[in-house]
Amino acid sequence: MKLEPLFNLDPNTKVRTRFAPSPTGYLHVGGARTALYSWLYAKHNQGEFVLRIEDTDLERSTPEATAAILEGMEWLNLAWEHGPYFQTKRFERYNQVIDQMIEQGLAYRCYCTKERLEDLRHSQEQNKQKPRYDRYCLHQSEYPVDAPHVVRFKNPTEGTVVFDDAVRGRIEISNRELDDLIIRRTDGSPTYNFCVVVDDWDMGITHVVRGEDHINNTPRQINILKALGAPIPTYAHVSMINGDDGQKLSKRHGAVSVMQYRDEGYLPEALINYLVRLGWGHGDQEIFSREEMIALFDIHSVSKSASAFNTEKLQWLNQHYIRSLPVEQVATHLEWHMKKHGIDYSNGPNLAEIIPVLSERCKTLKELAISSRYFYQDVENYDEKAVAKNFKPEAIKPLAKLAEKLTALSDWTVENIHEVMSQTAQELDIGMGKVGMPFRLAVTGLGQSPSMDITAKLVGKDRTISRINNAIAFIHTQNV
């Protein structure tokens, strides 16, 4: 059959991979890892990456799911050279190939009713036979062409299908185990397994990276490709991702959607780094830049074993990237979280200033955004436990002394603020804790925060002094 590419295929491209999600839900972490492996293998081999949306399930596919998949891919920065292509826009092409297959005797119309097929299955089960179509319609000519029918692929009945899976090694399946697959439904729509074959053929896909749940589809697809005279791609079926309890990853293990991880405050660099390690590695190395992944990744090195998703490990990686990426890059992502939590970050220090200060305690950008409120918003409430411990009447004197000395500062620096705290403790003959803890609670409303000299510097002089005075007034009201 004549190859009809969708785009000008570069004959020098030795590797062309694809990611082909179905838009029936969000982009989950398993799909994201498959996309990543496929993308990395293409980049490692100076190849091309194709994005295809397999939306033949008209009842379950939604525009919202398509948008979510595209958003997830863009957030992960997995750019594609070709696409996105939609199967629903290619029905004419699929049916053209099916009609040619019928003409060439590679496929045939099947007019069997549901009742006949159910009776056939029941009879085969009673006789301990594997349920399969008996080719009753293969040589039938009594039905009019326009009578309701499906189209079946005429699968070979002898021999075996053998392929060398890049992850799992040699896989061999007898053709006697395979049925005559329906490739076009009664309503005229082509079926998933057939669309995939034509797409991979038309798009010049050389390597198919996908989940192990597709292994059973592979021999059927290979037989169709052979019938069409099309090249057979290399297949790589990666294992599932389990939760840390060994069960298949699901919502009960926490977030499973890529964009949920964005919402929870994870950086795309952290999630990408974590996903690549779920089944692949390079020695004991844990941290990989994108450039290192591209240079080192090999699909043949991916493990056959299922991987366990460990949220604590992801959090560790995320904190690493928050602290090690250029602060301006992290700030760009943090802006989204600040807006989501209603924090006007234009009214205070630059985000690039607070990130190094808060990242020692925060593992996610969500935590960082929430922890930053006191830099931008007035303190309206105090932590109750901290109040009981640090806002006793004797805290008034060090707070008042602090306010007096801080007001006199002409140069609002970390060093000068620290010196004021030390002088206050010395003059009142008290420990630094008796100064620092009430000071912290007054300025942040919290019992814990970064060092108070740095915190006060970022909060600003006027706000700091105002909050100290508010705290003194609060202590008076509590002890009337």
From Swiss-Prot:
List of residues binding Zn(2+): C110, C112, C137, H139
Name this polypeptide is given: Glutamate--tRNA ligase
Localization per Swiss-Prot or TrEMBL: Cytoplasm
Protein task: Catalyzes the attachment of glutamate to tRNA(Glu) in a two-step reaction: glutamate is first activated by ATP to form Glu-AMP and then transferred to the acceptor end of tRNA(Glu).
Principal cellular location given in the protein's record: cytoplasm
Gene of this entry: gltX
GO cellular component: cytosol
Organism field: Histophilus somni (strain 2336)
Sequence motif: 'KMSKS' region, positions: 248-252
NCBIfam families per the UniProt record, alphabetical: gltX_bact
Subunit note: Monomer.
Highest rank taxon of the organism: Bacteria
